[in-house]
Amino acid sequence: YRNQLVLDLSNPKVQDYVFGVVDNILTENPGVAYFKWDCNSPITNIYSPYAKDKQGQLYVDHVRGIYNVLKRIKDKYPDVPMMLCSGGGARCDYEALKYFTEFWCSDNTDPVERIYIQWGFSQFFPAKAMAAHVTSWNKNTSVKFRTDVAAMCKLGFDIGLQELSDDELAYCQQAIANWKRLQPAIMDGDQYRLVSPYETNHAAVEYVDKSKTMAVLFAYDLAPRFQEKLHAVKLQGLDPDKRYLVKEINLMPGTESKFAQNEKIYTGDYLMKIGLDVFTYLHNMSKIIELKAL
């Protein structure tokens, strides 16, 4: 299977070997600022000469051996961010969060599918644990849509810059700057799943920072039906007594917002009880709305 055999990490000598390989790479290349740990082969021939008569607990011992290696690496290189790649298929768990800064949720980076993946994944892990990259998958969708979907988590890019037009490149640069500015809400704030893609033809997710002075709403139109009823999205987690400036961000160069409530001021109470009209009848469209307390 994949012309690979899985190393027996229940064996301490194998643990030493694996740690040594990674340690040598990082020692010889002190400029390494980030690396990912991939998991590409299942165990298809489970057996360990080291375990002898304890084969029944081999799966557990194997995983504990992996954690031991990861702990040693993290202890020696605490400042090097690590991604647990190939994270789908039950490879993500809370113990691994001790050693990895993020998970790769799935190799499926189609932005439409990612909305569902990220919605489900967020039931268990925070946005800062979910690596989400803009790629060339599903070029029927715009670079804006792909970027706006990835920005809902830990934003990254796996795309050739030569594929982007000047406007698309400028948009991505603007989106990155906005994402960095909104990190207190997206990465460290409270998440509210407002409109489920599993129950509607749209999706909406909101993040609010701890001080309730900054919030960001991600809204997506997936496949709306003809003349379906579009409902306002009622926000959550705001301070009802605060006044918030509502502004659409991440607009393509040369375009203007068509969001009717753009650059208007509302109380948190209004936004949570009445809401914002962010959805449209268009397919695969997105809006990112920033809310700033005044």
Where are these regions (language model features)?
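Active-site neighborhood of glycoside hydrolase catalytic domains
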Residues: 1-144, 154-159, 163-166
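Structural motif
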Residues: 137-147, 207-212
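Catalytic cores of secreted or luminal carbohydrate-active enzymes
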Residues: 144-195
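Hydrophobic, well-ordered secondary-structure elements that form the walls
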Residues: 38, 82, 150, 217, ...
